Amino acid sequence: MSTKDFNLDLVSVSKKDSGASPRITSISLCTPGCKTGALMGCNMKTATCNCSIHVSK
């Protein structure tokens, strides 16, 4: 079987690129009204509880 049989869009990374930062970072700034934090979202009573997720390129 050849390695060209399947194209999975994999990218090879060299060791010199090991200092790269993650592309997705998240910051949770929820108030006590958010029962379960950023994973479950905000409580209905506190729709603006300042939950946020930052995605960088």
UniProtKB/Swiss-Prot annotation:
There is a cross-link at residues 31-34, 36-42, 46-49, 48-51 (Beta-methyllanthionine (Thr-Cys)). InterPro entries: Lantibiotic_typ-A_Bacillales. Changing residue 50 to H: In strain: JCM 7638. GO terms for cellular component: extracellular region. One of its GO terms (molecular function) is signaling receptor binding. The modification 2,3-didehydroalanine (Ser) is found at residues 28, 56. The keyword RNA-binding does not apply. There is a cross-link at residues 26-30 (Lanthionine (Ser-Cys)). Lanthionine-containing peptide antibiotic (lantibiotic) active on Gram-positive bacteria. The bactericidal activity of lantibiotics is based on depolarization of energized bacterial cytoplasmic membranes, initiated by the formation of aqueous transmembrane pores. This is Lantibiotic nisin-Z. It comes from Lactococcus lactis subsp. lactis.
